[in-house]
Regions:
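Surface-exposed binding patches on compact interaction domains or structured appendages
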Residues: 44-111
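Bacterial signal peptide processing site
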Residues: 23-26
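A short beta-strand micro-motif common to beta-rich folds, especially ectodomain repeats
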Residues: 122-134
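C-terminal motif of bacterial Sec signal peptides marking the signal peptidase cleavage site
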Residues: 18-21
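Low-complexity, Pro/Ser/Thr- and charge-rich linker/hinge segments at domain boundaries
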Residues: 146-161
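Short, hydrophobic beta-strand segments
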Residues: 108-120
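Bacterial N-terminal signal peptides that target proteins for export
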Residues: 2-10
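Short, solvent-exposed loop/linker segments at the N-terminal edge
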Residues: 38-44
Length: 161
């Protein structure tokens, strides 16, 4: 009887020790169940991706083409920021070159807005936005359809003597 009681005590202590070892960092809310793919065009210039939790940040914006300048500011567009954003930080990421411009806005922890300016390339432009936290990272694939090119209606010259 004494050995059964001793085993029961050891079992209870072992379970208590295991439960005491768990902390809140182990239980992380999943912020995005799947890696979405987003398409923007001339008719659909804005797309919003919704998140399941607010424990994520914008980690970076990458493209397969070189020459895309990436800059970040606060929501008012005034103060410069660096990527990756700090935990819970909001802001706007601007991506631009001679043929393309778009922006990614994190206004709160539950949504990410993609806003297209123009894509003057002859084919769709693809970029990847990395979002995540210190435990998990996801990639959102974004495709921009080509927009209409500029057309010159007329050229006039003025000769000055």
């Amino acid at each position: 009887m004494k050995t059964t009681f001793r085993r029961l005590q050891c079992g209870i202590l072992a379970v208590a020790w295991l439960l005491a070892g768990c902390n809140s960092d182990v239980f992380i809310d999943r912020f995005l169940s799947a890696e979405p793919s987003v398409s923007l065009s001339e008719t659909e210039k804005e797309v919003t991706v919704c998140f399941e939790a607010d424990n994520w940040d914008i980690l970076g914006v990458e493209s397969l083409r070189e020459g895309v300048a990436v800059s970040a500011t606060d929501l008012e567009g005034k103060n410069s920021k660096y990527l990756p954003f700090e935990e819970g930080e909001t802001g706007i990421v601007y991506c631009k070159n001679a043929f393309l411009d778009f922006r990614v806005e994190k206004r709160n922890g539950s949504e990410l807005h993609f806003i297209s300016g123009e894509n003057l390339y002859d084919q769709p432009f693809e970029t990847f936005v990395r979002v995540g936290n210190r435990y998990e990272e996801k990639v959102i694939r974004v495709s921009f359809s080509p927009t209409r090119k500029y057309q010159i209606d007329s050229v006039s010259y003025c000769l000055l003597y």
